[in-house]
Regions:
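Conserved small-residue hotspots that stabilize compact domain segments
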Residues: 1-109, 155-175
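Disulfide-stabilized extracellular beta-strand modules
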Residues: 1-9, 103-139
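Low-complexity, polar-biased intrinsically disordered regions enriched in Pro/Ser/Thr/Gly
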Residues: 94-103, 116-120, 143-147
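Extracellular juxtamembrane "stalk/stem" segments on the ectodomain side of transmembrane proteins
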Residues: 131-170
């Protein structure tokens, strides 16, 4: 897994090209998937028709992006527990290094996991991290074209942390 420092600069519009192939949890045909496996510490997963496209929300009178980065694992079979570990690692990194003046940071409380394909060939397990849960009505990102190549989202699922982090540093007062 890459370090959080190496991935902080990734934005949702980045286009990644990888050559290693993962088998994921897809079956023989394109888009045929088994149900998403459970992950310790997360609620029962929701199988999705596409990846989440989360809007900005209002927080403290400002637009706030709940998206909190991504990870791509392309040397392992599909395993959403890798995404869970990445989510937890991102929260820890943000808590230690990215606390604002109000004592707030962006916790990872939700992730989507899916297989990204290029022209039907699996590239790897993609993990998109978020500060809050989004329901399946936001699962509208089915992929994109880049030149002549078609990148598709298959076997998507979402996972919400069973004990969400508030994203606030609490100070202990010693008396």
């Amino acid at each position: 897994m890459s370090s959080p420092v190496a991935t902080v600069s990734f934005l949702r519009s980045i286009h990644l090209l990888f050559t290693n192939v993962t088998q994921g949890y897809s079956k023989a045909g394109k888009g045929e998937c088994k149900g998403a496996p459970t992950v310790d510490g997360y609620n029962t997963p929701t199988n999705l028709k596409a990846a989440i496209n989360a809007p900005y929300i209002q927080k403290n009178g400002q637009n706030y992006d709940t998206y909190n980065g991504m990870r791509l694992f392309n040397t392992n079979p599909y395993d959403p527990s890798l995404c869970a570990a990445a989510c937890e690692s991102q929260t820890q990194f943000d808590k230690e290094h990215l606390v604002d003046a109000n004592g707030e940071y962006k916790p990872c409380n939700f992730f989507t996991s899916y297989i990204l394909t290029k022209n039907g060939v699996p590239l790897g397990t993609y993990c998109a991290l978020y500060t809050q849960s989004w329901d399946e009505s936001y699962a509208v990102n089915t992929g994109y074209y880049y030149g002549e190549d078609e990148y598709s989202v298959i076997c998507a699922a979402s996972y919400s942390d069973s004990t969400p982090d508030t994203g606030k540093i609490t100070e202990t007062v010693v008396v």
